[in-house]
Swiss-Prot record:
Residues 20-39, 55-81 are annotated as: Disordered. Substrate binds at residues 185, 201-203, 355-360. PROSITE patterns: COPROGEN_OXIDASE. The lineage of its organism: Eukaryota, Viridiplantae, Streptophyta, Embryophyta, Tracheophyta. The keyword DNA damage does not apply. The active site is at 199 (proton donor). InterPro entries: Coprogen_oxidase_aer, Coprogen_oxidase_aer_sf, Coprogen_oxidase_CS. The gene is CPX. This is Oxygen-dependent coproporphyrinogen-III oxidase, chloroplastic. The record marks 272 as: Important for dimerization. Belongs to the aerobic coproporphyrinogen-III oxidase family.
Length: 399
């Protein structure tokens, strides 16, 4: 079967389970053989599991156990000490650590159900989902490794080259460009209206030289982000969340937090509502204008910040008393979440159009949501306070 064919580099992770075009473990070398802290994941058998594919991507094959690595056995794969290898090891470690922290916070004995899949041409993924826990209505944490091919014009556009009829400005027409992409993507929907939803996603993208241009330079990008979507504003929680993001950013460049916060506010914008999806966080995309090792460490730091940014908030709010009115408002805000993901999120929409793995693509959606005709919260209410903050993003920290 032919490899994947994408239209732009930033869409590569749309082939990954649940990926969005926004959006990670120890930062250093090491083997791609990783351990999972939870060790209690329920695995779904390969039999009876239906998969979906189209001409855009290879059909995935269910696996009963995660392999030591999803990387191809070539010079840039397993055992090479490459960024690819370290990034895969990182996202798989983070997946295990986040799932373990969520299971502990849930406290019900509920466990993540795991699906493992691979593709014949290399790559694969691990989808983990917890539903109907005591604390979490639905929580998905997915990792994936994708190999494919993108059109040469997309490759040249990423390099800033101009040309006509598929030809580079200074050379003959080039062939399709092989690529590698890996990422972790997660959305966490708690039951309590006072406990916020969290989304995070971190990814790495890299090209190989086309067959007809073996000496062509390799291109690479990092992308990612972590953002918070509460139904009610509890400033202690929002400030804590943003302060953890800022601390992670400041370790590498003090300009990162203000720059990536604004990027986040701009990206998660529901145009037809004139609202942001939530109260932001950080977001960056196609980042390659810094040292590669520095950005690998930065993505790692951001992913390692997920648990300390989120779990303390969950512990404070998971047992907060609430009313039916609070729950109804949460469901309305969940509706906004659905609208953004299905209408605007580039990874979700691309995955739906190209026959991606549907269960993984839609794992970001909440288990329940609500749409109420012409609903507007009254002035002076806590609900209105949240809506105003989504319409007019604010600075949560003194910079």
């Amino acid at each position: 079967m032919a490899p994947s064919l994408l239209t732009t580099p930033s869409q590569a992770l749309a082939l990954a389970p649940g990926a969005a075009a926004s959006r990670v473990g120890g930062g250093g070398g090491g083997s791609a053989r990783v351990s999972f802290p939870s060790g209690r994941v329920q695995r779904r058998g390969a039999l009876g599991m239906r998969v979906r594919a189209s001409v855009a991507i290879e059909k995935e094959t269910p696996e009963s156990e995660p392999p030591p690595t999803f990387l191809r056995e070539d010079g840039s794969g397993a055992g090479s000490g490459s960024v690819r290898e370290r990034f895969e090891a990182m996202i798989r470690r983070v997946q295990g650590e986040v799932c373990a922290a969520l299971e502990e916070a849930d406290g019900s004995g509920a466990r993540f159900v795991e699906d493992v899949w691979s593709r014949p041409g290399g790559g694969g993924g691990i989808s983990r989902v917890l539903q109907d826990g005591r604390v979490f209505e639905k929580a998905g944490v997915n990792v994936s490794v994708v190999y494919g091919v993108m059109p040469p014009d997309a490759y040249r556009a990423a390099k800033g080259e101009a040309g006509k009829n598929g030809a580079a400005a200074d050379g003959p027409k080039a062939g399709p460009v092989p690529f590698f992409a890996a990422g972790i993507s997660s959305v966490l929907h708690p039951k309590n209206p006072f406990a916020p939803t969290l989304h995070f996603n971190y990814r790495y993208f890299e090209t190989d030289a086309p067959k007809d241009a073996p000496g062509a330079p390799r291109q690479w990008w990092f992308g990612g982000g972590t953002d918070l979507t509460p139904s009610y504003i509890i400033e202690e929680d929002v400030k804590h969340f943003h302060s953890v993001q800022k601390q992670a950013c400041d370790k590498f460049d003090p300009s990162f937090y203000p720059r990536f916060k604004k990027w986040c506010d701009d990206y998660f914008y529901i145009k037809h509502r004139n609202e942001r999806r939530g109260l932001g966080g950080i977001f960056f995309d196609d980042l390659n204008d810094y040292d590669q090792e520095m950005l690998l460490n930065f993505a790692t730091e951001c992913a390692d910040s997920v648990v300390p940014a989120y779990i303390p908030i969950i512990e404070r709010r998971k047992d907060t008393p609430f009313t039916e009115e609070h729950k109804a408002w949460q469901q309305l805000r969940r509706g906004r979440y659905v609208e953004f993901n299905l209408v605007y999120d580039r990874g979700t929409t691309f995955g739906l159009k190209t026959g991606g793995r549907i269960e993984s693509i839609l794992v970001s959606l909440p288990l329940t949501a609500r749409w109420q005709y012409d609903h507007t919260p009254e002035e002076g209410t806590e609900e209105r306070k949240l809506l105003d903050a989504c319409i007019n993003p604010k600075e949560w920290l003194d910079l």
